[in-house]
Every structure is written in structure tokens, then in C-alpha cells.
Amino acid sequence: MSLNALDCARLTGQTPYTVEVFRPIRNIFNRVREYTRASTTSVGLAWMSKYIYQYHRLMLMNLSPREPATEGWPLFLYPPPHLLVGYQYLVRTCNDYVFDTRSYSRLKYTEIHLPLQQKLNWTVMANCSYTINTGAYHRFIDFENFEETLAQVQQAVLAERVVADLALIRPMRGYGTTNMAGDRQVPVEGLLQDHYKNLSQCQNHAWGLADRMRIQNAGNKDIVILTTIRKLKTAFFNFLVSPRNPHTILSLPCDCLWLDAFMQKFTDPSLSQFQTIQSLPSQSVTKSIISALSLPGPAPCTPLSGGAFELRPRENGRAVTEEMRRRRGEMIERFIDRLPMRRRRRRAPPPPPMSEELSEPEVEAFPPASPPRRSFEEEVRDTIVEAIRLLQEELTVSARNEQFFNFAINFYEVIQRLEMLGNINELTIRRWVMYFFVAEHVATTLNYLHHNLRLYPPCSRWVDLELAQVVMRARDHEGQVVYSRVWNEMGENAFSQLMARVSGDLAATVERAGLGELEEEEMEQFMADIAYHENSGDVSEILRQVAINDTEVDSMELSFRFKVTGPVVFSQNRQIQSINRRVVALASQLRMQHRPLPAQHEQVQLPP
């Protein structure tokens, strides 16, 4: 398959005009003589890349003819003799995310010799990391400094896939530092061409890393849906933790669109009315968190009671909760129809509930058993569940992609088992909350990398993912490593396979909270539960993680390492080939004389 000019431009960050001048060719079989020897071998290209052209930086610049980057040594107003297809796109992908640090190994080159084929590939290992402040979660559970962290924690819980310490006002693009091939603090943002849209436009529509990443490629309809889902979850959580006020009696007409009023009431940006959450038991608050996070799934905990008002039990002689249940479908359909979007398919309106004014049915000898009485809180949750489910059906396929976010199932199953065993205590709750949000970050980041490196068609066609690794380092308040974990996977599906392993591993560890060190007979079963793989870290580190008191963990450093390989293309432009031949000749001459090479952009006289 030949590399087309459009894919080349997209993956190198160059303009179509530059690619047209460059005239790329992938396979140089039977054309090797047109190029200098150093340009066609892996050893020669590695020498040129490091000492003459500095490809690790040059490939990030605008290489159009007569641009500032091409002035003087070694380009002399023309593009370089090679383009590393996908390298600039890789750096741009890493740069556009909230990593604190990004490091890239030295570029390596390999030769491919097959019948009628002679090619070169480039390979680089990227290591991107950032630190999350898990101490904020402990303070939340302990209710220390609550007034300072309430807004952040509430966003972290309800934004879905985000933590409080990564504020959205912080720009993602270019944040942190970048090191390349021994060069420190490389100003990547200044080198990269800004081809992509400004992601800050999404910040008024959704919280959180995952929401922002999903909206990155979403249309207006998906933005409306994702924002509405977030508001419904926010409203439900605020409803659960609101203080019950016996002086406020809610009169709820059975034919009103109560879901609109409910969402508006409990998504008030002012959190002052919810400050009394501090007086609630920590387990009650955490159960409310879990119930909101699990939407639209079933509630993993025992039924919860909400506050804010007392519900008038009957309206005009009718049971309000029962009437809400009967009119639920109609009310949800009308709620979704009122959103500013066009629905995927019009649904037939549900039949109206039967009027009680009809003639009374004949009395049966054995009347059917009445359904179990439902609480108002259960009906509210079931209504929100159904509304979110229908909204998710309206999402486009790309926005609905959840393969990296089904990790929550593992955590909900754990909390259900703990609930049945009566083992929900401070230690298990603390570890569940901390690992859930760590898994949120891992899922969000791996999904972002998978979307950009595997699902983006030009990249998936030409750039191969060889291996991926996630490293998790827990540190105490002094910055010392408490324990570290490593997960490795190989191949094209490494990102999704990593997520499955990390989520199952962390969820299984929750059940061991507070139980101390593993006994000899328990160790084998635990290793089977987490599906331990060889070359996935020291077993002693896993045992240390299981037995640790989680209050010692103040921060968690997450490192994402991945090795990618892409094609090297050669220029067919005779002028570029001639300049390269003369540059290599001068560089070889200076090297033999043990003299330094000219500085970048220096004006020198090339040999004929």
C-alpha cells in the first residue's frame, strides 16, 4: 500500500504544498543509487538524524521551502531528505493532554529488506505521566477542610471520569515539560503547528477528562445529551445529600413535568444550601456517591433516602408515588423532546394512564396482590435511570463508545459483595473511593491514546503500536514511594487489554482493605483473582499494596509508556537529494578532521 500525500500531510503536520515539493516515496528498491549511502541505512540515518538534522526536533517544525526552519545549515531553504510519518502526530497527541511530563526515547531506525522492497522504519518509546492528589479523597472521607474541597469533590464525583485536582481552567495543550533524546525542557508547543481546534470550547458544556475527551469529536447533539446526563447525575446526588426539611411540603401535581423542575432545583451552581452534608455520616455520603456514579445501572447499595422536602402523600385522593410510576414513560419522553436536539427516531407516545373515573371493575373473589410499596427516592432514581438510558441511545456511535469505561462494573460488584457480607467499613470505603478515581484516570487516558493512535484512520494505517505499559507509583506525604505496580501488554489492542487488567486488579484489591498481609494459602487465590501476568512487576510490591494502610498514600503517579513504529519516507525531489548529498559530504569531512559541525541555520559553503 502506497502512502498518499494527504495521509503524509496529516501525520507529519506539514502542508500539502510541502508534501508536494517533497514528493514522498516509501519503497526505494531499485532507486537506492539516487540517494547518499547514509540516507538509506539504519546506521547512517541514525547518525544523520542525531548529529546533522536533529530529526527529533526538526520534524515538529514547519518545513515548507524558505520557512525560517529551513534557512542555512543543513536544509538550505528546502525540506529535509526524510519525513518520519506519524512522529509529529504522536508528539502532538501527547502534548494535547494533561500530562505533567513527557519524555521520548532516542529515535531508532530499522531496515526492511523483502523481495522487491527496501524500506526504513522509525521507532520511539513515549513515557507520559502525571500525578493525582489522592490525599484529597481521604480528606473528603474524613471531612477535613471540607468547606475548601466541597466544590472540587462534588465535581470529581459527578463529572464522571475526573478528579478534583485536575481543574478544567488549566489548559491541556502544552502543559508540563517535555524531554527528548537528552534535551531538557523542549518547547514543543512553540514547535508544533496548531492545526487542532481549541478544546477549551468544551469547558462550558461538561466537566471532567472523559466528558471533555468524548466531546472532542462530538457534534452539538452529543454535547446536549452528555451535558443533560451530567446534570441528571448531579441533581440526584444533591437530592440524596440535601437535609430533610419537615417545614417544606412538596405539592407535586401528577401531570407536571417534575423531572425538569427536579433537575433545575438540584443543579443550582451555588452549593451553600448543601453545606450541612458535613453533618451526615461518612458511609451515607459515600453510598450517595456510589449510587450517583452507578447511574444508569442498578443501585449497588441499599435504598437511600433523600431530603430537601417532605412529599405530600396524596394529591386529590391519589397516591403520588404510584401516579409518578404510572406516568413515568410519558413524562420522560416529554422531557427528552423538550431538549434542543433532533431525536434519532420518534417514539410512539406511551398510552395515557387509565382514568380512575371509569366504571369500577367487578369485585374479584381473590384480588391480585398489590405491588410492593415504593419510596419516592426509588421512583426518582428509576426515572433518572430510564431517562439516561434513553439519552444514551440517542448518542452517536463514537460518543457512545464505552469500552474503556466499563471498569465501573468491577467496582460495583465489589461493593455489592461487601454490602452482602456486612463488610463495608471505613477502610473498604476509603480504598474503594481512591481506586475508583485512579481507575477513572487510567481509563480516560488510555481511551484518549486509543482513540488518537488506534482509531484515527490515517494513524492506524501507518503507525503500529508495539507495546504499552501502565506504571502506578503510590507516594506518601514526603514523596517517598510506598508501593509501585506495573502492567504490560503487547500488540495493537494493548490499550484496551491494559484497562481490563488494571480495573480487575484494583477492584479485587478493595476487598482486602484492612485485612493485613496475605496468608500463604490466600496468596495463590488472590493472584488468580487479579489475573497476574509474568513480567508485570514484583510480587512483593503487590503484597505491599494489599496490606498498606491507604491513609499513608498522599499522591499517585501514573505513567503511560508506549512504543510505536512508523514509516520513513524519502524525497524524490532532485534538489533535496543534491543538497543532502553535499551536506553529508561536508559533515563526513569535518568528522574525519575532528572538527565540530556547523550550528543550526549557519550559512556555510557546501562542497560542489
UniProtKB/Swiss-Prot annotation:
- Site: Cleavage. Where? 175-176, 307-308
Please identify the protein, giving its name as recorded. Preterminal protein
Q: What interactions and quaternary structure are annotated?
A: Heterodimer with the polymerase; this heterodimer binds to bp 9 to 18 of the genome. Interacts with host POU2F1; POU2F1 binds to the auxiliary sequences in the inverted terminal repeats and tethers the pTP-POL heterodimer to the origin DNA thereby participating in the assembly of the pre-initiation complex (POL-TP-DBP-NFIA-POU2F1).
Matching InterPro entries: Adeno_preterminal
Say what the protein does.
Protein covalently bound to the viral DNA that acts as a primer for viral genomic replication by DNA strand displacement. Assembles on the viral origin of replication in an initiation complex with viral polymerase, DBP, host NFIA and host POU2F1/OCT1. The terminal protein stimulates the template activity over 20 fold compared to protein-free templates. Neo-synthesized viral genomes are linked to two preterminal proteins, one for each 5' end.
What post-translational events are described? Preterminal protein is used to replicate viral genome, upon genomic encapsidation it is processed first into iTP and finally into TP by adenovirus protease.
Recorded source organism is: Canine adenovirus serotype 1 (strain CLL) (CAdV-1)
Segments traversing the membrane: none
One Pfam family for this entry, by name?
Adeno_terminal
Q: Which residues carry this modification: O-(5'-phospho-DNA)-serine?
A: 536
> Where on this chain is Nuclear localization signal (motif)?
338-347
Give the molecular function GO annotations.
double-stranded DNA binding; single-stranded DNA binding
Keyword Metal-binding among record annotations: no
